[in-house]
UniProtKB/Swiss-Prot annotation:
Alphabetical list of Pfam families matching this protein: GATA (PF00320), GATA-N (PF05349)
Glycoprotein found in the keyword field: no
Function: Probably involved in bone morphogenetic protein (BMP)-mediated cardiac-specific gene expression. Binds to BMP response element (BMPRE) DNA sequences within cardiac activating regions.
Gene from which the chain derives: GATA5
Principal subcellular localisation of the protein: nucleus
An example molecular function term from Gene Ontology annotations: zinc ion binding
Naturally occurring in which organism (per UniProt): Gallus gallus
Entry GO terms, CC: nucleus
Segments of this protein annotated with the region Disordered: 53-100, 281-378
Regions of compositional bias (Basic residues) in chain numbering: 285-294
Protein name: Transcription factor GATA-5
Subcellular location: Nucleus
Domain of life: Eukaryota
Length: 391
């Protein structure tokens, strides 16, 4: 079925009359490929790059390894047809003459120099002939639907029309992306995006807010009021009543004229215009007290009462210690000595009155007066009441 490369018939001249030094056989018998540098000559041998030129006449020669007496071969690496020394028996052989152009060209040239009549119909050159880099298995019974004209009209023309229509479609998509609501706009407020589009009685589109307002109240939704002007933009305003330009709040009277805060409040409370004699150059502001002042008062009152209680106890103790003298008779002139019972009664009276006054007497102290007295047998701090005072 398959013929070896060595059994291929030699027809004398090689099928490809180009540089014969590209494919060399070494002494061992293995071929060595040497790439060619002549690119234009390679491009000229490609049949699908030829615009309207007829096929080369030497393409009709039978393919094969045309080996000469030497070890060189005439195979060119730039040839589009692979070398073939065998043929497929089921492929039909062409009966066309060798010099006729315009027939169907296949990748394998079968027989003694004849061309294959039918090839692959999907790859078409410019001059009307068909060529393919793959073996041709198409039988002569080619269906008419695979003709070149129908293929171009059904596939290529549809692709061209799609490419021509792409710019128009892109512009439409960009327009819809800029306006996500399919280009809708609320006829009342002019909104272009809303969670839900509604319609009024006339069929116009309304946004969700305007549609609900119109449905509930029966009237169109009022537009948002304009933002109030800043204080810098109101610098030219003047009170209609007192002609002042300085106020914390601008008001309007019954006629809609701007008035200052003082004149507006006076008119609202008394029903008559504010007298000009009450006009003041400076604005009197209210001194607001902090809101947590009551909590501060209760906390300070509790702390003062808590601090006063131990101080009163210490004062009462101090009165007892100052007024206590355990002697009944006065041994020194100018010094009054009070008994313990009298001192306790006086201290109770002082506590009841709430006041205690200590009035020292003027008398000279001598070193002998500071010495311990012989009449005192018991120290003063050893009494029972003194221990309570010092506790």
């Amino acid at each position: 079925m398959y013929q070896g490369l060595a059994l291929a018939p030699n027809h004398g001249q090689s099928a490809y009359s180009h540089d014969s030094g590209n494919f060399l056989h070494s002494s061992a018998g293995s071929p060595v490929y040497v790439p060619t540098t002549r690119v234009p000559s390679v491009l000229q041998t490609l049949p699908y790059l030829q615009s309207c030129e007829p096929h080369q006449s030497h393409l009709g020669n039978p393919p094969g390894w045309a080996q000469s007496s030497g070890e060189t071969t005439a195979f060119n690496a730039g040839s589009p047809h692979p070398p073939s020394g065998f043929s497929y028996p089921h492929s039909p052989r062409a009966a066309a003459p060798r010099g006729v152009d315009g027939a169907y060209q296949g990748p394998l040239l079968l027989g003694g120099g004849g061309r294959e009549q039918y090839g692959n119909a999907l790859v078409r050159s410019v001059n009307g002939s068909y060529s393919s880099p793959y073996p041709a298995y198409v039988t002569p019974e080619l269906p008419p639907s695979w003709t070149a004209g129908h293929f171009e009209s059904s596939v290529l023309h549809s692709l061209q029309t799609r490419q021509a229509a792409l710019p128009g479609r892109r512009s439409t998509f960009e327009y819809l992306e800029e306006f996500p609501g399919d280009g809708r706009e609320c006829v009342n407020c002019g909104a272009m995006s809303t969670p839900l589009w509604r319609k009024d009685g006339t069929g116009h589109y309304l946004c969700n807010a305007c549609g609900l307002y119109h449905k509930m109240n029966g009237i169109n939704r009022p537009l948002k009021p304009q933002k109030r002007l800043s204080s810098s933009r109101r610098a030219g305003l003047c009170c209609t009543n007192c002609h002042t330009t300085n106020t914390t709040l601008w008001r309007r009277n019954a006629e809609g004229e701007p008035v200052c805060n003082a004149c507006g409040l006076y008119m609202k409370l008394h029903g008559v215009p504010r007298p000009l004699a009450m006009k003041k150059e400076s604005i009197q502001t209210r001194k607001r007290k902090p809101k947590n002042i009551t909590k501060g008062k209760t906390s300070t009152g509790s702390t003062t009462s808590a601090t006063n209680s131990p101080s009163s106890i210490t004062n009462s103790d101090s009165t007892v210690t100052l007024k206590s003298e355990p002697s009944t008779t006065s041994q020194y002139p100018g010094q009054g000595i009070v008994s313990v019972s009298q001192a306790q009664s006086q201290s109770d009276e002082a506590l009841a009155g709430g006041e205690f006054k200590f009035e020292p007497e003027d008398y000279p102290f001598s070193p002998s007066s500071m010495a311990p007295q012989p009449g005192l047998s018991v120290p003063l701090r050893q009494d029972s009441w003194c221990a309570l005072a010092l506790a």
